[in-house]
Amino acid sequence: MDKFVKLTGVAAPLPVVNIDTDMIIPKDYLKTIKRTGLGKGLFAEARYNEDGSENPDFVLNKPAYRDAKILVAGDNFGCGSSREHAPWALLDFGIRCVISTSFADIFYNNCFKNGILPIKVSQEDLDKLMDDASRGSNAILTVDLENLEITGPDGGSIKFDLDAFKRHCLLNGLDDIGLTMEKGKAIDEFEKKNAASHPWAA
């Protein structure tokens, strides 16, 4: 998993509340267990018309936001089913940070396991960031995980809180497998001691 230390990029505004995982990645895209290729299905029902053509009114289809790395969204983002394809689709599109006032718990935790930083802010701060994100090609935000700070295009900054363990994992690019590998030496030592003290169990 790629480390997340500091991210600077275009932030796309999506001022919609209760965006569920079915909206993020419709069920038609859930047949695969691969993490790649799902970006094309991200927000598919909103991004595409019935004939498959792009909906020019959807934010991620607008030229200024096609390469967005940050999403500023309404309250209760990621509610609905627990499909891990939702963060996979965001990541495959190129989005590594989602900012909202609240997230569904399962989606929130799945983000950290996939290298995405979900940030919770107050409604006042979200309104400011949503305004920043509405500046089109000038909607550049910098998310500094080391200092727990978001800097807007005008130079103003917003602080955010994050669990220390989750922060450690993102800064070091550690998913569940990475965390286990990090303890590899201790696991090997335990197995040697356990085999010596319980030879009948070997």
From Swiss-Prot:
Q: What is its EC number?
A: 4.2.1.33
Q: According to its UniProt record, which reaction does this protein catalyse?
A: (2R,3S)-3-isopropylmalate = (2S)-2-isopropylmalate
Entry's Gene Ontology molecular function annotations: 3-isopropylmalate dehydratase activity
Q: Which Pfam families match?
A: Aconitase_C
Can you cite a GO biological process for this protein?
L-leucine biosynthetic process
Recorded hits in SUPFAM superfamilies, A to Z, give: LeuD/IlvD-like
Q: By its UniProt entry, which InterPro entries does this protein fall under?
A: 3-IsopropMal_deHydase_ssu, Aconitase/3IPM_dehydase_swvl, AconitaseA/IPMdHydase_ssu_swvl, IPMI_Swivel, LeuD
Q: Which keywords fit this entry according to its UniProt record?
A: Amino-acid biosynthesis, Branched-chain amino acid biosynthesis, Leucine biosynthesis, Lyase
Q: Name one GO cellular component term.
A: 3-isopropylmalate dehydratase complex
Recorded metabolic or biological pathway in which this protein acts? Amino-acid biosynthesis; L-leucine biosynthesis; L-leucine from 3-methyl-2-oxobutanoate: step 2/4
Annotated coiled-coil segments of the chain? none
Q: How does it assemble?
A: Heterodimer of LeuC and LeuD.
As for family, the record states: Belongs to the LeuD family. LeuD type 1 subfamily.
> Briefly, what is this protein's role?
Catalyzes the isomerization between 2-isopropylmalate and 3-isopropylmalate, via the formation of 2-isopropylmaleate.
Tell me the protein's name: 3-isopropylmalate dehydratase small subunit
Point out the gene that encodes the protein. Answer: leuD
